[in-house]
Amino acid sequence: MSLIRLNIDSFRNIQLAQLSPSSGINLIYGQNGSGKTSILEAIYFLGMGRSFRSHLSQRVINNEQDKLTLFATLNLPRGDSKIGLRRFRSGETEVKIDGEKVKRLSTLAETLPIQVITPESFSLLFEGPKSRRQFIDWGAFHSDPQFYAAWVNVRRVLKQRNQLLRNNSSYDQIQYWDREFVRYTEQVTEIRNRYVDSLNELLKGIIGEFLPQVDVKVSFTRGWDSKTDFAQLLESQYPRDLATGHTVSGPHKADLRLRVGSLPAQDALSRGQLKLLVCALRIAQGKLLKQQIDKHSIYLVDDLPSELDAQHRQLLLKQLVDTGAQVFVTAIEPAAIVDSLHTPPSRMFHVEQGRVTVIE
């Protein structure tokens, strides 16, 4: 799978751009503020319905316009597919796939799986468990068609349960929701656990390429003691949950634990090593997607020269090429990427003040 055409209209400082990317390595270069990262952000927005840089989607709309429009043609095994997204400053979103209106943004994510390696994505290890849950759930969503519905139900029931707790409801009033919570939690947890097990099989070899002298152990924690029955735990922790006004334990507390020896990876590794570990996780996740559903991710790699030294840039780019996936990578100077590749980029784009030029 790859993008063979991309149209960007009124996205940040890009008034209008049309790109015909290669299915291999696409290098986008230009000075800071030129708009090169905005191209990656536009692709991400088209696949996720949101930005990886800002939680306020209205900010990505060009200041002089009341809406943005993104359009792409995808090359898929079954043939070409067309995706369009329009976001209005009012917050309304319109999505079409092959001319048909789509109501759920999850359909975009299913159609256009995207992996991001940016300065922001390194928060996967530097921050709390939320980003690591999102990492697991991205893979679980793509690997098992039953995951999304179960995950939505977990969120719905958890919201209802927390509202009852804030209202000082008796446990008799909460019991019905707990039965629902347990049922959907079991589904979500089983799929998450199975996904992490599969990821681990691939991850060992890839981590060995990036960090050959480091033994990293990866494990999934479900959000409560695995030796404890979840239904019994909810009942026994009801007084504590009532006191805090929210559910203390459950699938919303799940995490991906990475350890080196007896220490968390965050404490045992340098910041540079942690960045390489995040790269290994993203590469492994993309390779597993290809194994499980025979679909490539699209990789968006932003500002690589500022994040990794020349040796590790070369290693990451080699790994990306080996995936066979389509890659978009940005840099200020093209030489920083070209010199790290064994072969020239398949296509190069220069960006200046929001204008995109193909370099032949």
From Swiss-Prot:
Subcellular location: Cytoplasm
Alphabetically ordered keywords of this record: ATP-binding, Cytoplasm, DNA damage, DNA repair, DNA replication, DNA-binding, Nucleotide-binding, SOS response
GO molecular function: ATP binding; single-stranded DNA binding
Lineage: superkingdom: Bacteria
InterPro entries recorded: DNA-binding_RecF (IPR001238), DNA-binding_RecF_CS (IPR018078), P-loop_NTPase (IPR027417), RecF/RecN/SMC_N (IPR003395), RecF_2 (IPR042174)
Gene Ontology CC terms: cytoplasm
Major subcellular location class: cytoplasm
Family named by the database record: Belongs to the RecF family.
Protein name: DNA replication and repair protein RecF
Provenance organism: Shewanella sp. (strain MR-4)
